[in-house]
A protein has these predicted regions:
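Acidic/histidine-rich alpha-helical segments that form the ligand environment
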Residues: 1-21, 67-117
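Carboxylate-rich helix-loop segments that flank metal/cofactor sites and access channels
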Residues: 47-86, 90, 138-143
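DHp/HisKA dimerization-phosphoacceptor four-helix bundle of two-component histidine kinases
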Residues: 7, 34-41, 87-90, 117-124
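A generic hydrophobic-segment detector
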Residues: 97-143
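Conserved alpha-helical segments that form or flank metal/cofactor-binding pockets of metalloenzymes
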Residues: 26-63, 123-137
Length: 143
C-alpha cells in the first residue's frame, strides 16, 4: 500500500504543479504551489518509510496564503479554474479515503502515525480548496 501511496503523491505533485501553471488567479496559483510542496513532502515521507527509515514529518514551511474575507465575492475567473479545482477536490477526497485503509492495515505504529499525519494534511488541502471555491462562487453549499 505504501508504494500505491507514493504513486498517488507523485500524481498529486504533478497535478498541483500543472494546474498552478494553468489557473488565472494569482492567489489560486500560490495556493496550488503551496499544496504541491506539501504533496512532495508526503511523497518523500513515504519514500523514507519504504526505505525502512522513520519519516521526517516536519514541513519545510511553505508560505501561508491569505484567504479572501469576502465570502460573497463573485467568481471572476474562468470556467477552466473551476473544473481544475473540482478535479483537485475529488482527488483529495479519494486520497484521504485511500489513507483510511492504509491506517487500518499498518502494523508499525510509526508508519500509522505518519500516515495519519499525511491524511490530516490531505483533509486540510481539501478544506483549502473548498474554501477558495466557496468564497469565489464555485461551490454552492447546501444546508
Amino acid at each position: 500500500l505504501l508504494e500505491d501511496g507514493k504513486k498517488q503523491e507523485q500524481l498529486c505533485v504533478k497535478k498541483y504543479q500543472g494546474y498552478a501553471n494553468s489557473v488565472q488567479d494569482v492567489q489560486l496559483k500560490n495556493l496550488l504551489m503551496e499544496i504541491a510542496q506539501e504533496e512532495q513532502h508526503h511523497h518523500d515521507m513515504i519514500d523514507q518509510m519504504l526505505q525502512g527509515m522513520t519519516p521526517n514529518m516536519t514541513h519545510s514551511g511553505g508560505a501561508t496564503i491569505p484567504q479572501s474575507n469576502n465570502m460573497f465575492e463573485s467568481f471572476s475567473g474562468n470556467t477552466n479554474d473551476q473544473i481544475l479545482l473540482e478535479d483537485l477536490l475529488s482527488t483529495e477526497k479519494y486520497v484521504s479515503s485511500f489513507y483510511d485503509t492504509v491506517v487500518f492495515e499498518s502494523a508499525d505504529p510509526k508508519v500509522r502515525q505518519a500516515i495519519q499525519h499525511i491524511q490530516k494534511d490531505e483533509q486540510n488541502h481539501g478544506q483549502k480548496i473548498f474554501n477558495y471555491m466557496n468564497s469565489h462562487g464555485m461551490y454552492d453549499v447546501k444546508y
